[in-house]
Amino acid sequence: MLVVAEKEIAGLMTPEAAFEAIEAVFASMARRKAYNFPVVREAIGHEDALYGFKGGFDASALVLGLKAGGYWPNNQKHNLINHQSTVFLFDPDTGRVSAAVGGNLLTALRTAAASAVSIKYLAPKGAKVLGMIGAGHQSAFQMRAAANVHRFEKVIGWNPHPEMLSRLADTAAELGLPFEAVELDRLGAEADVIVSITSSFSPLLMNEHVKGPTHIAAMGTDTKGKQELDPALVARARIFTDEVAQSVSIGECQHAIAAGLIREDQVGELGAVVAGDDPGRGDAEVTIFDGTGVGLQDLAVAQAVVELAKHKGVAQEVEI
């Protein structure tokens, strides 16, 4: 078994490589060459933590495995980030474990890559202003990935804890973009593309906030009860997701479904847009990508890292 330590990931995986891997996975899913296993995601009743498993099998790339981990909101006292995970890959021919890969940075990179894929295919023409909702650990990755696929002129942002907005300001400066902190109503009115990446359990961006052609990448809702968007806003939009079954059960669409505002068959697959089987935005004023995060995304970036680690000689071989 090969082990690729968390400390090695930053020197191996780039945002560009993550984007390429995730875009390919979306297309494989649309062509039914790859599928995700049912998600296990539970509150464990200790440290307010959420823990679970996401896995899948990509028959076209012969990649099999799972990611184990979750969200520990009190990790700051341990000087650790809140998201903790490890990816395990298995030989699809024998079932033997083939690799264990640190999953923390990979999770941030693949989540950002997924929203960037949605921006590439669904952003309104002439989009100039990027709106960021949330300033946690993953927000910087999200902003960089968005800027990699679209030329924005300005970034505006909001966070429930304003003292954290310096992360967004610093990242925007790194990208050579001006940044302004704004309230949510102004963010919804001015941003052409909005990325939300929070752990909220109540709606933040309301229907009346959003004006004009807009694409929203809703990346924070991946558990029952979590919510970032007003269900009326979801109902107003043309909706795409990574996995429909997850979107309607643990994603942003769970609330609009429960309220009877949308049907499951109104939720499209982003992979179909990537594969050229769905026109995507069309004449919709608002599009939403409900990014629930799927195991296949984790496996794709982990497999890419393993190959890079072998090439650079930084993968450790162990017997178990």
UniProtKB/Swiss-Prot annotation:
It comes from the Bacteria. The gene is bhcD. Induction: Induced by glycolate. It comes from Paracoccus denitrificans (strain Pd 1222). PANTHER family: KETIMINE REDUCTASE MU-CRYSTALLIN. It is an enzyme of class 1 (oxidoreductase). GO terms for biological process: glycolate catabolic process; glyoxylate catabolic process. GO terms for cellular component: cytoplasm. GO terms for molecular function: NADH binding; oxidoreductase activity, acting on the CH-NH2 group of donors, NAD or NADP as acceptor. The keyword NAD applies. The active site is at 67 (proton donor/acceptor). This is Iminosuccinate reductase. Signal peptide: none annotated. Disruption phenotype: Abolishes growth on glycolate or glyoxylate, but the deletion mutant strain is still able to grow on acetate, succinate or glucose with comparable growth rates as for the wild type. Its EC number is 1.4.1.-. Iminosuccinate is a labile compound that spontaneously decays into free ammonia and oxaloacetate in solution. The beta-hydroxyaspartate cycle (BHAC) consists of BhcA, BhcB, BhcC, and BhcD enzyme activities. Overall, it converts two molecules of glyoxylate (C2) into oxaloacetate (C4) without the loss of carbon as CO2, under consumption of just one reducing equivalent and regeneration of the catalytic amino donor, which makes it one of the most efficient glyoxylate assimilation pathways. Keywords: NAD, Nucleotide-binding, Oxidoreductase. It catalyses: L-aspartate + NAD(+) = iminosuccinate + NADH + H(+). Imine reductase that catalyzes the NADH-dependent reduction of iminosuccinate to L-aspartate. Is essential for the growth of P.denitrificans in the presence of glycolate and glyoxylate since it functions in glyoxylate assimilation via the beta-hydroxyaspartate cycle (BHAC). Thereby BhcD regenerates the amino group donor for the first step of the BHAC. NAD(+) binds at residues 110, 137-138, 159, 199, 219-222, 226, 291.
